[in-house]
Amino acid sequence: MLVQSWKNFIDNLLLPPGSLIDKGAHRFALCLVVLPALVLMFFLWKPWIHGNDGVRHYVYCRSAWLDLDFNFTNEFSWYMARGELQKITIDQVTGLPGNSQGCGSAVLWSPFFWLGHLVALITPYATNGYSAPYVWAVCAGTSLYAIAGLALLTSVLVWRFGILPALLSIYAIWLGSPLLFYMYLHPSMSHGCSF
C-alpha cells in the first residue's frame, strides 16, 4: 500500500495545475505535511500559559467553565502572583478587571479544556483549571488546530496548483513564518488557533 502510494505520489508530483491528481498521491502529500508537524510536537512543544496575551486568552475558558462567570479577578490574581501577568485594568462601568483579548481561542479550546478536566478528575491533579492537564490540553488544541489548518491549506493548494508547488509553499509558510513558534513554543497565544 505504501509503495503504491509512493509511486502514485511520484507519478503525480509534476502534473500541471488542474490535472486530475490521484487520491493516493494527494493523501501521501498530506502525510508529508501532517506527520512532520506531529513529530515536531515531541521535540519543540512547550505547553504553558504565560505572558499577558496568553493569560488573557486562557482566563475566558477557565472562568466560563469553572467559575461560570466572566469575572477574571481570581484568575488574574493567580497569574499575577506567579509573575505571568503584569497589569490589570479595571473597567470603569462594571468595576471588574477588563480583558483586552477576545474570547475566540477560549471557544476553540473548550473541548480540549473539558478533556483536561476529565484527566484531572481521574488523576491526582487539581481540578482548579490551572493544573497540568488543563494547560497541556489547551496547548495541544492550539497545535492541532494549526496542523489542521496546514492540512486544509495543503489540500487546496494541491488541488489548485499541483503537488510540488503545494508542498514547497506549505513548507515555506510553515517554516518561514512565526507559525512554527506559535504552534509549539507559545501555544497560549491565539495565532495558532487563527491559522
Please give the residue ranges for each predicted region.
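Start-transfer (signal-anchor) and selected internal transmembrane alpha helices
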Residues: M1-F43, V138, V158-L167
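Residues at helix-coil transition
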Residues: L15, W65-D67, H117
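Transmembrane signal-anchor helices characteristic of membrane glycosylation enzymes that use polyprenol
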Residues: A25-G51, V59-S63, D69-N71, I170-P178
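Transmembrane-helix signature of polytopic, membrane-embedded enzymes
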Residues: F28-L32, L121-G129, A148-S177, F195
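Short glycine/proline-rich turn/loop motifs
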Residues: A37-L44, G83-G95, T127-W136, P178-F181
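Extracytoplasmic catalytic/substrate-binding loops of multi-pass membrane glycan-assembly enzymes
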Residues: W48-Y60, D69-Q86, P97-P111, G192-C193
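Short, hydrophobic secondary-structure boundary micro-motifs
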Residues: F72-E75, I88, P124, F181-M183
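Loop-to-helix entry region of an early transmembrane alpha helix in multi-pass inner-membrane enzymes
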Residues: N99-S110, L118-A151, Y184-G192
